[in-house]
Amino acid sequence: MDGDRSKRDSYWSTSPGGSTTKLVSDSERSGKVDTWLLILAFTQWALSIATVIICIVIAARQGYSMERYSMTVEALNTSNKEVKESLTSLIRQEVITRAANIQSSVQTGIPVLLNKNSRDVIRLIEKSCNRQELTQLCDSTIAVHHAEGIAPLEPHSFWRCPAGEPYLSSDPEVSLLPGPSLLSGSTTISGCVRLPSLSIGEAIYAYSSNLITQGCADIGKSYQVLQLGYISLNSDMFPDLNPVVSHTYDINDNRKSCSVVATGTRGYQLCSMPIVDERTDYSSDGIEDLVLDILDLKGRTKSHRYSNSEIDLDHPFSALYPSVGSGIATEGSLIFLGYGGLTTPLQGDTKCRIQGCQQVSQDTCNEALKITWLGGKQVVSVLIQVNDYLSERPRIRVTTIPITQNYLGAEGRLLKLGDQVYIYTRSSGWHSQLQIGVLDVSHPLTISWTPHEALSRPGNEDCNWYNTCPKECISGVYTDAYPLSPDAANVATVTLYANTSRVNPTIMYSNTTNIINMLRIKDVQLEAAYTTTSCITHFGKGYCFHIIEINQKSLNTLQPMLFKTSIPKLCKAES
């Protein structure tokens, strides 16, 4: 072992290069370590002191900043409060000032301006609406119109089929359609309502009737009631007449024999204003005054009265009356049918029938126009033309229908359907059968009458339902018919289905030779008088309004009643 130790010492004493190295003792190495530890500890202490000093400095600075921050925030709060108070004060002052201005304007300024502007607008509208070319524009501001798809029945459009030929069917039998009736009536037990007149225009309808407060005498003082309205559909999808405005004319004016026209948004009514009875009127020269009444949908009314000297008559008349039934509107004119007695008879040959009649000649027919009961005056039909009816003072011209084209002058109606004008006249003379045809209003006036063999009217014994031979008589009753086909061969009407008595009102659909479909209103004993029928279409489906003067027998008075039916038109399949 000593040998090993000697070798180990020799190894540590000599370097590989062969040089000799002196080894450090343990005590020397321990002293150096202590020195370095002391230096390190001092350094740490110095750093700690520096850190503490730095922290103190930073803390001091932060305290100063916080104090300045607090002072700044407090200053901002104070400034904000001052600004807020200033703004609030400013806003309060502005609001109070503006509120005062607004209050002053609302209470004083605006009403004054509105009144002025309203007056200016009213003056402008009145000035415009007084001009003929702007009348329709002013009227169109009233939003009243028939329901969509409803229009007056036009025969050329209605009497056709997609395939086959149209015809009136007897099956099923016509029946009354449900719905309300708002025709004007009387408020007294003995009041009598007469002479219903209905005109259906493209937008509205006009209806007029005469109310006599005591009994039914024609010369009795009476109210005239004119209604305007539109046609709507009820919950059953059937058409109804819905009045919008109504005007009652003074009983002291005593209007009689009124005819109506509905055109645009106005209703026009032409009446006689007699102060004597009919027979006295025919026995004197000159006619009783006529009056043209105008009513619009706002209820405004205007009337123009005309004396004999203010009317342009083509011949001198002893009596002249509107024909009760509706008239028509053409461009710039209204045309009403009228009738009356000529002071001097016209020369010419009237409509006549000689074949099959004994001891009858053309002279018999000519003389039959001169009615003894009316002072022997020749009774003719006329066209009463109201020209410039939109002007401040319309002009009236009367044109006599040539006696060569007509039967005995009588009450009647005109209808303008499409491009054709249809005429109906009451069968007051010897010709008892339905008188309906096409009127050509150009010069000379001509009428193409459609012969009807099936329809007639009751009359006195000499001129009853079946009479066809000429003789002097004045009888019959007003029961107009509405043309369903262009030639007026197919018609809708209400006839008093009796020989001599005004009884048994019956709705009829007929052609020239046969009554195809009919409905009796009640029974053969029901008393009635005048009837008028007007028809419409709703998207091609045809309906008719029938107005009948019914005698309320328990009260012994007349009151128009409204009935409705569906037109029994079918299409015959082509073979």
From Swiss-Prot:
* Glycosylated residues, chain numbering: N77, N499, N511
Record membrane topology: Single-pass type II membrane protein
Q: What ranges does the record give for the region Disordered, renumbered to this chain? A: 1-25
PTM summary from the entry reads:
N-glycosylated; glycans consist of a mixture of high mannose-type oligosaccharides and of complex-type oligosaccharides.
For the keyword Transmembrane helix, the answer is yes
Note down the stretches annotated as region Incorporation in virion: 10-14
Q: Which stretches of sequence are listed as region Involved in interaction with F protein?
A: 59-140
Q: What class of enzyme is it?
A: hydrolase
Q: Which reaction does it catalyse?
A: Hydrolysis of alpha-(2->3)-, alpha-(2->6)-, alpha-(2->8)- glycosidic linkages of terminal sialic acid residues in oligosaccharides, glycoproteins, glycolipids, colominic acid and synthetic substrates
Compositionally biased region (Polar residues):
11-24
Which of UniProt's keywords are assigned here? Disulfide bond, Glycoprotein, Hemagglutinin, Host cell membrane, Host membrane, Host-virus interaction, Hydrolase, Membrane, Signal-anchor, Transmembrane, Transmembrane helix, Viral attachment to host cell, Viral envelope protein, Virion, Virus entry into host cell
Q: From which domain of life does this come?
A: Viruses
One Pfam family name from the record? HN
Q: Where is the composition biased (Basic and acidic residues)?
A: 1-10
Map out region (Involved in neuraminidase activity) in residue numbers. Answer: 254-259
Q: Where in the cell is it found?
A: Virion membrane; Host cell membrane
Can you name a GO cellular component term? Answer: membrane
- What's the main place this protein lives? virion
Q: Which cysteines are joined by disulfide bonds?
A: C192-C216, C258-C271, C357-C469, C463-C473, C535-C544
Q: Where exactly are the transmembrane stretches of this chain? A: 38-58
Domain statement = The C-terminus (head domain) is involved in binding the cellular receptor.
According to its UniProt entry, what is the function of this protein? Attaches the virus to sialic acid-containing cell receptors and thereby initiating infection. Binding of HN protein to the receptor induces a conformational change that allows the F protein to trigger virion/cell membranes fusion.
What protein family does this chain belong to?
Answer: Belongs to the paramyxoviruses hemagglutinin-neuraminidase family.
Subunit structure, briefly?
Homotetramer; composed of disulfide-linked homodimers. Interacts with F protein trimer.
Q: What is this protein called?
A: Hemagglutinin-neuraminidase
